Swiss-Prot record:
Top-level taxon: Archaea
Sequence repeats: from-to residues: 10-86, 101-177
Keyword Repeat set for record: yes
Biological source species: Pyrobaculum aerophilum (strain ATCC 51768 / DSM 7523 / JCM 9630 / CIP 104966 / NBRC 100827 / IM2)
Name of protein: TATA-box-binding protein
Family: Belongs to the TBP family.
Length: 199
């Protein structure tokens, strides 16, 4: 039973950064030409980096939310670049602030069709209501993620706190579905038999 196995790609990492100091956003907005700051509409200052392509929401309290990173290395580089930018423009921020990943979103492909009707009966913490949403919602307990599974084999994984969590969750899901006999992998143009038929 050879198959391509699962693949995935990280689409977005959301992280919070605690700079540990209060910031003068008005002053920063004046000094940083690329900053967007309109306190009547939004209380934070918005900075967009191009390399890596990341957006940062910076708040007066010294908290920062970074979105758009595709991997943890890009996130680290972006935080370093943002800290340098803030320091260069008068903010007294630490060089190595506390960074915490809040959510990683990844899209993937199991490279096999999934029998969602059967999968929902066999997986714990799964919900499938096709008249409301075409995917099965699976809450995996370890790692703690939520995976949307579609009949085509496409998946979306959310809630991971590290790249390792994503890799573990995707492989674990694939193995579980394979063991349950609800994956249909095309091999030589023919669909593999259902697990029940192999018994």
């Amino acid at each position: 039973m050879s198959s391509k196995g699962p693949s995935y790609r990280i689409e977005n990492i959301v992280a919070t950064v605690n700079l540990g100091v209060e910031l003068d956003l008005e002053q920063l907005a004046e000094r940083l030409t690329m900053a967007e700051y309109n306190p009547d509409q939004f209380p934070g200052l918005i900075l967009r980096l191009t390399k890596p392509r990341i957006s940062a929401l910076i708040f007066r309290t010294g908290k920062m939310v970074c979105t758009g990173a595709k991997n943890e290395e890009d996130l680290k580089n972006a935080v370093r670049a943002l800290v340098k930018l803030l320091k260069d423009h008068g903010a007294d921020v630490p060089f190595d602030p506390e960074v915490q990943i809040q959510n990683i979103v990844a899209s993937g492909n199991l490279h096999a069709e999934v029998d969602l009707e059967q999968a929902v009966l066999m997986l714990e913490n799964a919900m499938y209501e096709p008249e409301q949403f075409p995917g099965l919602i699976y809450r995996m307990s370890s790692p703690r993620v939520v995976i949307l599974i579609f009949g085509s084999g496409k998946i979306v994984c959310t809630g991971a706190k590290s790249e390792k969590d994503v890799a573990t969750a995707v492989q674990k899901l694939y193995n579980q579905l394979k063991e349950l006999g609800v994956l249909y992998v095309e091999e030589g143009g023919e669909e593999l038999e259902e697990f029940e038929e192999e018994l």
